[in-house]
Structures are given as C-alpha cells and as structure tokens.
Design a protein with these regions (language model features):
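Active-site-adjacent loop and "lid" segments of alpha/beta metabolic enzymes
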Residues: 16-60, 79
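Active-site-adjacent beta->alpha loops and helix N-cap segments on the catalytic face
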Residues: 4-25, 71-80
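Hydrophobic residues within beta-strands of alpha/beta enzymes
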Residues: 1-2, 65-66
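Conserved functional loop/turn residues at catalytic and ligand-binding sites
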Residues: 61, 69
Length: 80
C-alpha cells in the first residue's frame, strides 16, 4: 500500500512492475480535505477533480484505491 497516494504517483508506477502482488493506494484524509475545501471555495469542480485524481492513481498502477470519496465516486461513475 502506498500512502499518501497522490504525491507518490511515481512510486506507484515504479512498484507496479516489480512485484507480483496487488498494489493499493490510500488517498489519505488530507488529500480528501484539500479537494473538499477547494471545491467548497469554488476553485475546482469537485466531481471532475476527484475522478481525475482517482484515474491518475489507476494509471500509475494502483489495482485498488482506498478513499474517503468512495461512495461519491461510485455514484458519479454509475451516473456516467
């Protein structure tokens, strides 16, 4: 497991091919708070920013992602 997730996209990518075990990323509470606060201030579109952050983790090699946005992200993906 790699945490915090977003600052270590390069680590996720490097680990991806080195081990034959599932790789998980944990989007910690600080990352959640950062996105939530910026969205509340109108600085970004919460849905787009959150989904992009999760897609970035997946592209970097995470096979599973633990996030405080899990329920919202599931709803957003279902609506898409």
């Amino acid at each position: 497991m790699v945490k915090p997730a977003l600052p270590y996209l390069d680590v996720l990518s490097a680990l991806k091919g080195r081990f034959a075990k599932p790789l998980f990323a944990y989007q910690v509470s600080g990352e959640y708070a950062m996105l939530k606060a910026a969205a509340l201030k109108g600085w970004l579109d919460e849905r787009r920013a959150v989904l992009e952050s999760l897609f970035a983790l997946r592209r970097a090699g995470a096979q599973g992602i633990l996030t405080y946005y899990a329920l919202e992200a599931a709803r957003w993906l279902k609506e898409a």
